[in-house]
């Protein structure tokens, strides 16, 4: 990306914030009247054209104004959005919930999710994950020359069977070698760490397995079908139609499928584990869902139970607010319950 000036950065900031607040494409006239009265119209138009050329802004087809692109939102989120809540009544409601010692921590978190979802009109997902489930063994049973059953056993007594199909019977030997490596190196590894561990073993596997990409992908998919006691609760589905971007039938269907999905949350959790971030924004294009944003944070209830809170929003969202709300809950939890 070409270097952009401080003025152009501020211009992008104003356009994002105005579009988030109004849902109206932003033209040079609005920018000058509301944000940059001392800058000439020609300069603003040139800067907007430059930001568009960089892919940070897009032209709206129904007006002369611009709207942020996904890249523009990402730039804004990274450079300008700081966690912040200016709704004191909302903070008071949440504090009162956390102060109520007659409720269990699970109920406190549920009530907090409901309050936030009702306030923002956005879905809020609570995901509980028992991270103590360990991999105990992987076995393979040959069915015929083109298929085999992979059996995965975990510490909670769960036994998962899946069939792998392949064209070349030589792959059977590759699968057997790969499983032997896994059993040597991954036994008693927490399920949530499997992906990272396997990633670090790729060079070893590549040396011993001819069709390592196919075999590795197939086995990883089988391992990831193990659900380590994941319990998902969704709040705010009924408010989806209040979000203009979700009123399109196909987009609404996509959002509902996301809320029912499990794999999407595993991808997001994997990304958060890699970054080590307390509160993370994941843009939908990173997980094959355009024009959607996932904001998440983790609450460590105890050593066995990790709870993830996720908000699902359109890219046109107040990033400071959703980050602020999640950090507020995390801070209240850590002050009084951890």
UniProtKB/Swiss-Prot annotation:
A molecular function (GO) term: DNA binding
Gene3D superfamilies: 3.30.450.40, Heat-inducible transcription repressor hrca homolog, domain 3 (3.30.390.60), Winged helix-like DNA-binding domain superfamily/Winged helix DNA-binding domain (1.10.10.10)
GO terms of biological process kind: negative regulation of DNA-templated transcription
SUPFAM superfamilies the record matches: GAF domain-like, Winged helix' DNA-binding domain
Key word Lyase present: no
InterPro entries membership: GAF-like_dom_sf (IPR029016), HrcA (IPR002571), HrcA_C (IPR021153), WH-like_DNA-bd_sf (IPR036388), WH_DNA-bd_sf (IPR036390), WHTH_transcript_rep_HrcA_IDD (IPR023120)
Keyword entries, A-Z: Repressor, Stress response, Transcription, Transcription regulation
Family, as annotated: Belongs to the HrcA family.
Function of the molecule: Negative regulator of class I heat shock genes (grpE-dnaK-dnaJ and groELS operons). Prevents heat-shock induction of these operons.
PANTHER family linked to this entry: HEAT-INDUCIBLE TRANSCRIPTION REPRESSOR HRCA
NCBIfam families listed in its UniProt record: hrcA (TIGR00331)
HAMAP family: HrcA
Protein name as catalogued: Heat-inducible transcription repressor HrcA
Species of the source: Malacoplasma penetrans (strain HF-2)
